[in-house]
UniProtKB/Swiss-Prot annotation:
Its EC number is 1.1.1.37. Disulfide bonds: none annotated. One of its GO terms (molecular function) is L-malate dehydrogenase (NAD+) activity. It comes from Mycobacterium marinum (strain ATCC BAA-535 / M). PROSITE patterns: MDH. PANTHER family: MALATE DEHYDROGENASE. This is Malate dehydrogenase. The active site is at H188. Belongs to the LDH/MDH superfamily. MDH type 2 family. Catalyzes the reversible oxidation of malate to oxaloacetate. The keyword Iron does not apply. NAD(+) binds at G12, A13, A14, G15, Q16, I17, G18, N106, Q113, T130, G131, N132. Substrate binds at R93, R99, N132, R163. The gene is mdh.
Length: 329
């Protein structure tokens, strides 16, 4: 275990997702049993005491791979030299808040964090945004970090991707490992489009295996898209452990690469592929290698899928317009 520690910065580290995420990172879930991790944890001042308690628990686990922990409320200190930044902390939507209020509140957070990353992060920085509205928060951070290559920013749609795999596996009676090439298009919101028309179940086309368009339209798509709300309804709190798990999955795929026979979903900067306007951060099917992603090209998009992709893309364009008018990008 001679490799130098990967410096992983996590924002909102004392929150619910952070509480699940930090122990996964420290135990080696990200890069395996041979790469030590240094955690750099950012929180707002009032949450630092709670974060100290979490660090006590991390200490008490005596994780062999955890080489150090630094906590604080100053992004420039916490992001200094970071190789991976997981931006989990975000302002939740409160009672009476309009979406524009939410965009504005988070805009201030992600503007400041983008600027700090731009100044002090390591040259090989990768930035994953989990805090919602994730796509547009990633766009704001990216825009405020002009010296970091734009392809180094991604927003999390891996949770939706994992949810879609789970639903399809249950429907077809196979293991989740038998599902390949699932795709989430668009925004991490209720307009997202979980697309199984290119997915495979044990090597066969998923839509043909399911052979039930009504199930796809009336159950599969809305169940995946509205799963977060269903969990809040059942649990009385938002999905935290599954979001943390997906955050680890996404970062691991990004850093270590995708298998030759599969792809993953990541919200990344559009190059105009599949009719998604350039400059939006939208979810696509991507392959990864050596820490870089590539949008899967050449997939046929039928009329049904086209309408769904256009709808979620329009929402992303509206969000970009709103934050542009707020002067955030």
């Amino acid at each position: 275990m001679s490799a130098s520690p990967l410096k992983v910065a996590v924002t909102g580290a004392a929150g619910q997702i952070g509480y699940s995420l930090l122990f996964r990172l420290a135990s080696g879930s990200l890069l395996g049993p041979d790469r030590p991790i240094e955690l750099r944890l950012l929180e707002i001042e009032p949450a630092l005491k709670a974060l100290e308690g979490v660090v006590m628990e991390l200490d008490d686990c005596a994780f062999p791979l955890l080489s150090g922990v630094e906590i604080g409320s100053d992004a420039n200190k916490i992001f200094d030299g970071a190789n991976l930044a997981l931006l989990v902390g975000a302002r939740p939507r409160g009672p009476g808040m309009e979406r524009s209020d939410l965009l504005e509140a988070n805009g201030a957070i992600f503007t400041a964090q983008g600027k700090a990353l731009n100044e002090v992060a390591a040259d090989d920085i990768r930035v994953g945004v989990t805090g919602n509205p994730a796509n547009t928060n990633a766009l704001i951070a990216m825009t405020n970090a002009p010296d970091i290559p734009r392809e180094r920013f991604s927003a999390l749609t891996r949770l939706d991707h994992n949810r879609a795999i789970s639903q399809l596996a249950a429907k077809t009676g196979v293991a989740v490992t038998d599902i390949k090439k699932m795709t989430i298009w668009g925004n991490h919101s209720a307009t997202q489009y979980p697309d199984l028309f290119h997915a495979e179940v044990k090597g066969k086309n998923a839509a043909e295996v399911v052979n039930d368009q009504a199930w796809i339209e009336e159950y599969f798509i809305p169940t995946v898209a509205k799963r977060g709300a269903a969990i809040i309804d059942a649990r009385g709190a938002s999905s935290a452990a599954s979001a943390a798990s997906a955050t680890v999955d996404a970062a691991r795929s990004w850093l270590l690469g995708t298998p030759a026979d599969d792809w993953v979903s990541m919200a990344v900067l559009s190059d105009g592929s599949y009719g998604v306007p350039e400059g939006l951060i939208s979810s696509f099917p991507v392959t990864t290698k050596d820490g870089n992603w590539s949008i899967v090209k050449g997939l046929e998009i039928d009329e049904f899928s086209r309408g769904r992709i256009d709808k979620t893309t329009a929402e992303l364009a509206d969000e970009r317009k709103a934050v542009t008018e707020l002067g955030l990008i």
